[in-house]
């Protein structure tokens, strides 16, 4: 750190040296250093001399040369717009130090004719590269586009967003690969300095050579805006380039077509522009250059692009493109010198059309997503209504975008979940029913790992003597469909809101006979007997048998359990409104949502746990019962209803929720303390 008293003197000295030191050109006519080493251990470096080959592995040499002789100096003037004056502040060297360094290097110059020849050849190669027509053409495109975006295209805009720069890079570097295949890697390295990519690994640059790139970007971010600018500068700067543009609607294609025409006519001579409105084509021909073309089409006229030759094909709002148009578009993948660039916003209205997100698992990294939510905090974002940014990232918002809590609430009132998808760019959370995950992964991990050892006396003596069992019967032998789910819960004496899952069953009937109720009741009784072995302090069991499927069968199950149970069993009863009779069954209704909400809260807060000695006669033989339950817990989703309420479900094509419902309802009855359980013979 500089001392305050020395700061003024240092500033004065720097000003004096800056004013007296003249800018000198980088002289490559004679070598500065020629090393006295064997030919196999040296290399000719065009900007310095003949140096030991080991220096090529050091970034210091490259950094030094680019600092004092950057490629971006002395650039040609742009054809339109204002040239960006890049700041270039190289360290100033005192004259005495400069003289001393020159003295040292002059003493170490070895007069080697062969080495001089090697150096001159390296210098000539460097000059040839810098005078190559392809390099000059591509450099002119970069300068033109940079200058055009520097307050020319839009007066108040001089900067572009990171995703817009990435779109430019995918376009530009693919141009290099098709314009100069033999010099692709060398030109890749040269243009790294133009885009500020000096530190990027060369292997990473190969991504830009992909045949297809996909960009998923939220609404109103300037997707089409930057495409118009890129295409306009491509036509005017690069000869013999053929560009295609496909939109999902005719008016969008016409709008882009008109905007490009207006841009070209405003900033470039009209005599170079040939417009063919009947087929949406623009031909731009500069003097002494081959013409470049643009064709704008829509997905409704898919045959218009068949038979065409495109080097770059931009597919705008690709998620909304008609599916029968995709074969005509994807056919250009076979063309060796063609690249497809899919650009789209998220289609939250229809998951079936959001096909671009399927490429997230592609072997090539071709999917680029602008998203304000990271995968690790997606759950937090869905659970907290007031959250408008990712908890771990500083939310970068473009100046022309507004994201706040009011916008979020209003947008979601129109379409639930639209804020997350349309505005925040989150694709992975889309579903047909706009479902949201409600249990965090951290809570599930804690539930799985932190299991109580209920065989220890100090734990057992803290448990109540009443066990709660819920039975969700299924009268089918189809193992691919629903089975009978049974859940058993014990609560703590000192805190009835805390409980332990001690048993669960998922029972499937072997065949459809008249003994279905007996088999289900026997399964429940086996669970009760096994519980008494581990927990002999249990004095009674409170049972709820769901009767939604068949009330008669549910009554039969309750009766059989009452007869076969080794201890007292109390049942919840349902009162018949017509006969005032009470049946030992439970009719599941609106309380299901309340039960799920209390269970979700218990999992997230850690007030429910599982026993290490979980009882299961049907699951444990092939699967860990708790892992079996966790698989269903992960599938819990909340469905919003039209009346503003919510319902919960965990059913999936490959996962049923029978065991989960039984455990959830058993927990609900064990902790709610508002239901009456009575003996079967009670009136």
Curated annotation (Swiss-Prot):
Which catalytic residues are annotated? Answer: 317 (for atpase activity), 472 (for nuclease activity), 546 (for nuclease activity), 658 (for nuclease activity)
> EC number(s) for this protein?
3.1.-.-
Classify the source by domain of life: Viruses
What is one process in the GO biological process aspect for this record? chromosome organization
Q: Which Pfam families match?
A: DNA_pack_C, DNA_pack_N
Motif Walker A motif boundaries: 217-224
* Residue ranges annotated as motif Walker B motif: 312-317
CC annotations in GO: host cell nucleus
Please list the GO terms describing molecular function. Answer: DNA binding; hydrolase activity
Q: Where in the cell is it found?
A: Host nucleus
Assigned keywords, A-Z = DNA-binding, Host nucleus, Hydrolase, Viral genome packaging, Viral release from host cell
Q: What class of enzyme is it?
A: hydrolase
Instruction: Name residues in a coiled coil.
Output: none
Predominantly, its location class is: host cell
* Oligomeric and partner information: Interacts with the terminase subunits TRM1 and TRM2. Interacts with portal protein.
Q: What does this protein do?
A: Component of the molecular motor that translocates viral genomic DNA in empty capsid during DNA packaging. Forms a tripartite terminase complex together with TRM1 and TRM2 in the host cytoplasm. Once the complex reaches the host nucleus, it interacts with the capsid portal vertex. This portal forms a ring in which genomic DNA is translocated into the capsid. TRM3 carries an RNase H-like nuclease activity that plays an important role for the cleavage of concatemeric viral DNA into unit length genomes.
Q: Which family does it belong to?
A: Belongs to the herpesviridae TRM3 protein family.
Please state what the protein is called. Answer: Tripartite terminase subunit 3
């Amino acid at each position: 750190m500089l001392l305050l008293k020395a700061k003024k003197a240092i500033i004065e000295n720097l000003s004096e040296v800056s004013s007296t030191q003249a800018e000198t050109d980088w002289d490559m006519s004679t070598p500065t250093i020629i090393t006295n080493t064997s030919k196999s251990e040296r290399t000719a470096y065009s900007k310095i001399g003949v140096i030991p080959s080991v220096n090529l592995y050091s970034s210091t040499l490259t950094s030094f040369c680019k600092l004092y002789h950057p490629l971006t100096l002395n650039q040609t003037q742009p054809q339109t717009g204002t040239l960006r004056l890049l700041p270039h502040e190289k360290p100033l060297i005192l004259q005495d130090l400069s003289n001393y360094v020159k003295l040292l290097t002059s003493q170490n110059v070895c007069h080697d004719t062969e080495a001089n020849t090697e150096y001159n050849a390296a210098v000539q190669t460097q000059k040839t590269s810098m005078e190559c027509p392809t390099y000059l053409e591509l450099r002119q495109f970069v300068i033109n586009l940079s200058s055009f975006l520097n307050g020319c295209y839009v007066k108040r805009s001089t900067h572009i967003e990171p995703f817009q720069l990435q779109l430019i890079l995918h376009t530009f570097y693919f141009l290099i690969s098709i314009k100069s295949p033999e010099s692709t890697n060398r030109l890749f390295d040269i243009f790294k300095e133009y885009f500020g990519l000096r530190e990027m690994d060369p292997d990473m640059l190969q991504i830009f050579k992909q045949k297809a790139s996909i960009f998923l970007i939220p609404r109103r971010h300037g997707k089409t805006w930057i495409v118009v600018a890129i295409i306009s500068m491509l036509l005017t700067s690069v000869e013999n380039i053929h560009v295609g543009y496909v939109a999902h609607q005719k008016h969008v294609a016409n709008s882009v077509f008109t905007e490009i025409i207006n841009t070209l006519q405003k900033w470039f001579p009209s005599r170079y522009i040939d417009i063919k409105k009947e087929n949406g084509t623009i031909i731009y021909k500069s003097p002494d250059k081959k013409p470049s073309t643009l064709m704008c089409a829509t997905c409704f006229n898919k045959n218009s692009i068949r038979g065409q030759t495109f080097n770059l094909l931009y597919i705008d709002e690709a998620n909304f493109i008609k599916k029968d148009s995709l074969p005509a578009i994807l056919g250009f993948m076979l063309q060796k010198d063609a690249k497809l660039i899919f650009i789209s916003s998220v289609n939250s209205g229809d998951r079936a059309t959001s096909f671009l997100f399927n490429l997230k698992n592609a072997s090539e990294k071709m999917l680029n997503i602008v998203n304000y939510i990271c995968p690790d905090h997606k759950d937090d974002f869905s659970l907290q209504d007031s959250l408008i940014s990712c908890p771990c990232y500083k939310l970068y918002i473009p100046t022309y975008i507004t994201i706040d809590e009011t916008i979020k609430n209003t947008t979601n009132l129109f379409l639930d979940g639209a804020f997350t998808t349309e505005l925040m760019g989150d694709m992975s959370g889309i579903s047909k029913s706009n479902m949201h995950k409600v249990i965090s992964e951290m809570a599930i991990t804690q539930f799985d790992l932190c299991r109580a050892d209920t065989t220890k006396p100090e734990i057992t003596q803290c448990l109540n003597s009443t066990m709660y069992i819920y039975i969700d019967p299924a009268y089918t032998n189809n193992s691919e469909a629903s089975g009978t789910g049974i859940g058993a819960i014990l609560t703590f004496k000192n805190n009835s809101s805390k409980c332990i899952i001690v048993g669960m069953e998922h029972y499937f009937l072997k065949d459809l006979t008249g003994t279905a109720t007996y088999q289900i009741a026997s399964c429940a009784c086996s669970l009760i007997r096994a519980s008494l072995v581990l927990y002999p302090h249990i004095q009674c069991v409170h049972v709820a048998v769901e009767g939604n499927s068949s009330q008669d069968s549910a009554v039969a199950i309750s009766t059989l359990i009452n007869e076969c149970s080794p201890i007292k069993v109390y049942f919840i009863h349902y009162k018949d409104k017509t006969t005032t009779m009470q049946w030992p069954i439970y009719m599941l209704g609106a309380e299901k949502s309340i039960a799920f909400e209390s269970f979700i809260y218990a999992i997230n807060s850690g007030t429910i746990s599982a026993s290490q000695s979980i009882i299961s006669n049907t699951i444990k033989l092939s699967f860990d019962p708790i892992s079996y339950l966790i698989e269903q817990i992960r599938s819990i989703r909340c469905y919003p209803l039209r009346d503003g309420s919510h319902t919960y479900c965990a059913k999936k094509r490959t996962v049923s929720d029978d065991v989960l419902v039984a455990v959830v309802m058993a927990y609900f009855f064990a902790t709610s303390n508002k239901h009456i359980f009575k003996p079967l013979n009670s009136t």
